[in-house]
Amino acid sequence: PLRAPSIRLVVSMAAGEGVAQAAAVDQIAARAHSHAAEELEAALAAEEEEEAARRLPLYLALCNRSPDMLAALLAGFDGASAAAQATVQELLPGLLLHLPMEAVTEVLLAQLRGEPDASPPLSAASPLPLLALHVLADRATAEGGTVPAALTAGVLGLVSRLGPHGGAYAVPLLPFLDESQAVAVLPALLRLDKGDLTEALAALAHAEPPPLAPRALLLQLHLLKPEDGERGVPLKALIDAIQACINEREVFTRAELTAALEEVVQLDPLPLLTMRTIIQTMVNWPDAATAVMGLLRTLLKREVWATKLWGGYVRCCTMAMPLSRELFYAMPPAQLEAALASHPDVKQKLVAHARAERGA
């Protein structure tokens, strides 16, 4: 087996350093690559991590000189032994920290697409391409830069093809998206598990600067239609997403929530979760009551009783008593009668208030 000094010598010679004749360079490089390929094959079949760690360095060293060699490593990963997979995942980040991002991007996207030959694309469930994306994203953040535009565009273009794993591939890139890209990827994010979804929304909200301002993110979530067409998302996931935003009180402040809701209540048709968000805003921000009254007035002017939101509207008004008395008085007679019939406690309070007003 080759020791570290030998590895460095072979790599140096393969790159042509100190070799005068091109023919000699080609011959040495071919031998180095052939031996490295054999070592890679043996490493991926190794049953012990120690053996895999002993055989991989030559191949990884040559990847420094020829990043396109990453393709074979990525392609062979899924069929490798458990020990080899663990070793590759341990060693790969160190390599990716030093390779040109553009070169890694080209190899990674080609493998995800199944290019350039007829070989099947990498499995979307494989941890290796996801690991590579996270390493590149962390590196870009640490360096105060960004990831290559080709990486962002390429991964987002593959999100739908990657099925349920598509959202996970977008997560590392969220801080680097522009507004239109962030909006486009939201449906895929909402197909993540609840915990991953919460982390993804936090990554969007805490990015500097965020691709979507907090109020814009809330608005876009309300614009998504549950299980309706290509952009449809599971209703439970949409509820979880909006609630996760509301729970991020440092980012989604009272002002951000009410500003977003002022836009939501003007939408036509009114989003299905409008009243739920208003109620949760009241619960999380009791001092938002005055702003909420303004939202409820707007909805009443828009004849909210003719929509599916009416039940939630009445519930919200009952929660807001006594501030909401005027809203009950402004309801059409038939709707007021039905609302009071289902909430006799509110009826008693309104009657008592009316009597007090007459007595005064």
For each predicted feature, which ranges?
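Eukaryotic alpha-helical solenoid repeat scaffolds
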Residues: 1-360
